[in-house]
């Protein structure tokens, strides 16, 4: 997985767009952060 500090704002926005359509992922992002939520539901950040 890619450490959160190495993602550009555009990459972070892309993760949010994927995650927000999944209610469970979106809720996890609110508490654990978008990178943690994305990796838990979709695997390593591309």
From Swiss-Prot:
Q: Using the record's annotations, give every residue carrying the modification 4-carboxyglutamate.
A: 13, 17, 20, 27
Q: Fetch the PROSITE patterns from UniProt.
A: GLA_1, GLA_2
Keyword Disulfide bond present in the record's keywords: the answer is yes
Q: Which keywords does the record carry?
A: Biomineralization, Calcium, Disulfide bond, Gamma-carboxyglutamic acid, Hormone, Metal-binding, Phosphoprotein, Secreted
Enumerate the residues binding Ca(2+) 1: 13
- Entry superkingdom: Eukaryota
Q: Which residues form the Gla domain?
A: 1-43
One MF annotation (Gene Ontology) recorded for this entry: hormone activity
* GO CC annotation: extracellular region
Q: Which residues bind Ca(2+) 2?
A: 17, 20
Sorted alphabetically, the Gene Ontology BP terms of this entry are: biomineral tissue development; bone development; cellular response to insulin stimulus; glucose homeostasis; negative regulation of bone development; osteoblast differentiation; regulation of bone mineralization; regulation of cellular response to insulin stimulus
Q: What does this protein do?
A: The carboxylated form is one of the main organic components of the bone matrix, which constitutes 1-2% of the total bone protein. The carboxylated form binds strongly to apatite and calcium.
PANTHER family reported in the protein's UniProt record: OSTEOCALCIN
State the name under which the record lists this protein: Osteocalcin 2
Species, as recorded: Solea senegalensis
Taxon lineage: Eukaryota, Metazoa, Chordata, Craniata, Vertebrata
Name of the gene: bglap2
